[in-house]
Each structure stands twice: as structure tokens, then as C-alpha cells.
């Protein structure tokens, strides 16, 4: 199993870090203030450690970017562009603005012709970014329980990295739908807005997307 670095001290980072541990991966979880993760480390089941963004990015063979969207570019800089070069970087982020939803629709700081993932890929051109885990709530990211296996839409420029992400997603209970290159992150990131609407309007957060064909 490869070593997985999870960058982020929030709920998404915790859920995914625990998911990787559950499925047998060694995990280093990272924060700007690693001491805040001491409680997580002491209770983690598996080969778990903590460190700074740079520590984790150097150590990890697969990187998971699990910070809020407004902090994503800074987190990538702190991780070190050289440290993520040539590695699969699973980008879970969405460009959510620091503003309240408008009639149930989350506000983004990007527009329809640009994605946050594209900004990140430009900042770290040698990293093999794959967009994933951004279109569902954290409670369903690992081993989701639905009537059918849900679909995770992914994209990225590197076929090998997407294959690696697909393998991880399969272990976590997901069907993967490859939507092509990094530009596809524009509509994939918008899926977060769509996913959240039933939650804001009807308090319905227990759902996921399914790609179906005849």
C-alpha cells in the first residue's frame, strides 16, 4: 500500500484519513498546526502520524488536498510544489466563497469558465491532479450505504493518476466516471452546488449522484 498524505485538519480530512487507515494505508495527516491533530493521532486505528503540509507532501506517495477551497492555493504552496511533483494529488476542494447561500445555492468565487482545480494545476504543473470526493458530503465519502453504488465524477490530465484514484474510490465503495481532462472540473465542481440544494431547502443531506446508461 502506498503512503497517503492528507492535507487538512477539518472534517473531510479526518473522514478520508480514517478511511485510508481502515483500508490498510499508512497515513500522515497534515495541518498548519500539527499539534492540533494529536487527539486524532492518539485515537487513530492503523499506521497514523501527523506533520506540517510540507512534511506530509514530502512523505506521501499519494497526496489528498482536503482543505476549504479558499485555502487550497495557499495549502499547495505550503506543501511545496516540488514535493508534489510527479505524484497523484486527489483534489477534494470546491471554490466556495465566504458568503451565505443564495436561495439554497452555494456561492463560488470562480466563474463558469474556470475551476479551482485549474488554478491548482497551474500552480503545481508537475503534480498529477485528480478531482474527486467533492460532490458528496463527508458522511458518505467512505463506504456509503445507498441502494446502488453511487457515482463519483473525476477528471485530470494524467491517465495513471486517474487509474490510481479509481482504485481508491472502488475500495471506498464508489463507481467512478472519468470525465476527461482538468477543464471538466468546471462542471464537476458545480455538482457540489447541486448536491447541497436539497440540504439547504429540505434538510435532505443523505443522497449522492448516480450515472446511469440504458
Identify what each model region corresponds to:
Residues 111-135, 143, 164:
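Short, glycine-/small-residue-rich phosphate/pyrophosphate-handling segment
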Residues 1-49:
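NAD(P)+-binding Rossmann beta1-loop-alpha1 motif at the extreme N-terminus of oxidoreductases
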Residues 2, 87, 150:
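Nucleotide donor/acceptor-binding cores
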Residues 150-214:
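Active-site-lining helix/loop region of Rossmann-like oxidoreductase modules
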Residues 41, 45-90, 94-102:
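Rossmann-like NAD(P)-binding element
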Residues 103-113, 144-160:
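Short beta-strand and adjoining strand-loop segment in the mid-core
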Residues 50, 90, 128-134, 177-179:
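General beta-strand structural signal in soluble alpha/beta enzymes
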Amino acid at each position: 500500500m502506498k503512503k497517503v498524505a492528507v492535507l487538512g485538519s477539518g472534517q473531510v480530512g479526518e473522514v478520508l484519513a480514517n478511511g485510508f487507515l481502515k483500508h490498510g494505508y499508512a497515513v500522515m495527516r497534515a495541518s498548519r498546526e500539527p499539534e492540533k491533530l494529536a487527539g486524532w493521532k492518539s485515537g487513530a486505528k492503523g499506521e497514523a502520524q501527523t506533520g506540517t503540509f510540507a512534511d506530509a507532501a514530502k512523505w506521501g506517495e499519494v497526496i489528498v488536498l482536503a482543505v476549504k477551497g479558499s485555502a487550497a492555493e495557499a495549502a499547495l504552496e505550503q506543501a511545496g510544489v516540488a514535493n508534489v511533483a510527479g505524484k497523484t494529488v486527489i483534489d477534494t476542494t470546491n471554490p466556495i466563497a465566504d458568503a451565505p447561500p443564495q436561495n439554497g445555492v452555494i456561492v463560488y468565487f470562480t466563474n463558469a469558465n474556470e475551476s479551482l482545480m485549474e488554478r491548482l494545476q497551474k500552480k503545481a504543473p508537475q503534480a498529477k491532479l485528480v478531482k474527486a470526493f467533492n460532490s458528496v458530503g463527508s458522511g458518505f465519502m467512505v463506504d456509503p450505504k445507498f441502494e446502488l453504488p453511487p457515482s463519483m465524477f473525476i477528471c485530470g490530465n494524467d491517465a495513471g493518476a486517474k487509474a490510481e484514484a479509481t482504485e481508491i474510490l472502488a475500495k471506498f465503495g464508489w463507481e467512478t466516471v472519468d470525465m476527461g481532462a482538468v477543464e471538466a472540473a468546471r462542471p464537476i465542481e458545480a455538482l457540489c452546488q447541486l448536491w447541497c440544494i436539497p440540504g439547504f431547502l429540505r434538510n435532505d443531506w443523505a443522497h449522492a449522484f448516480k450515472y446511469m446508461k440504458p
